[in-house]
Amino acid sequence: MLILLTNDDGIASPGLQALKDALKERHDVVTLAPVKDMSGTAHAISRGEDIKLTRIAEYEVAINGTPTDCVMAGLRMVLRRPPDLLVSGINMGANVAEDLSYSATAGAAWEGALSGIPSMAVSLCGSAAPWHFESAIKVTHMVIRQWLENPLPPGTFLNVNVPNVPEYELKNPKPTRQGLRFNWPPPPVTAAGNPAFWDPTIPTPREEEFQLATDEEALRDGFTSVTALHCLFRHPHATERLKAWSLFR
């Protein structure tokens, strides 16, 4: 199987290199990744700039652009045929809830799905070493095997978040939904009534009631989270309700 591998932490990221080495044992892997850390660039592309491709090694290319640029270059310039799978990761840090709006790890998988390629984003959910890449690699192999046996609908991409624990401590993955994690508190104000500062790292929990656990809830309970997403911004239920508006009569 031919796999296109990318990430948003950059070509030198140990997470990317560990996953590349592991996937190469079972598959043909072509790696295109940013020259530098491009975390938080979401689904952005570079406009008005020349994109330079630098060959680092055989089947490994660094690009002075975003992860989405990497996917586009891989599909349109580097690969001779479409890959069977696109994998973005291993990201060093969680990508859950509204993180997905900003995550370039997920953005690369999103671009793959838009191009008709089964795609997945893989994140190892910790904040400091030691990084247990072997755990994320094990889950990645498991998800790939299941996807081959039970293909998902076109346009689907998966967001996989693995607890940063040793492989022997891993629990079975859980299917999850994207959560909505935070209510942002109002910033403190000065005596003149102006906002003093804004700190997006100080949230308050938002309570929700749904049958399927959220991605963050699964992680909090020590499980790997696997969330199926669609590459198109569409909401069938809302569209049906929209049809009832008098605006369209």
Swiss-Prot record:
Tell whether Hydrolase is among the UniProt keywords: yes
Note accompanying the cofactor annotation:
Binds 1 divalent metal cation per subunit.
Q: Localized where?
A: Cytoplasm
Q: What is its main location?
A: cytoplasm
Matching InterPro entries, A to Z?
Answer: SurE (IPR030048), SurE-like_Pase/nucleotidase (IPR002828), SurE-like_sf (IPR036523)
The record's keywords, sorted A to Z, are: Cytoplasm, Hydrolase, Metal-binding, Nucleotide-binding
Which reactions are catalysed by this chain? a ribonucleoside 5'-phosphate + H2O = a ribonucleoside + phosphate
Keyword Amino-acid biosynthesis recorded: no
Q: Which GO molecular function terms does the record list?
A: 3'-nucleotidase activity; 5'-nucleotidase activity; exopolyphosphatase activity; metal ion binding; nucleotide binding
- Report TM segments: none
Q: Which family does it belong to?
A: Belongs to the SurE nucleotidase family.
Functional description taken from the UniProt entry? Nucleotidase that shows phosphatase activity on nucleoside 5'-monophosphates.
Q: What is this protein called?
A: 5'-nucleotidase SurE
GO CC entries: cytoplasm
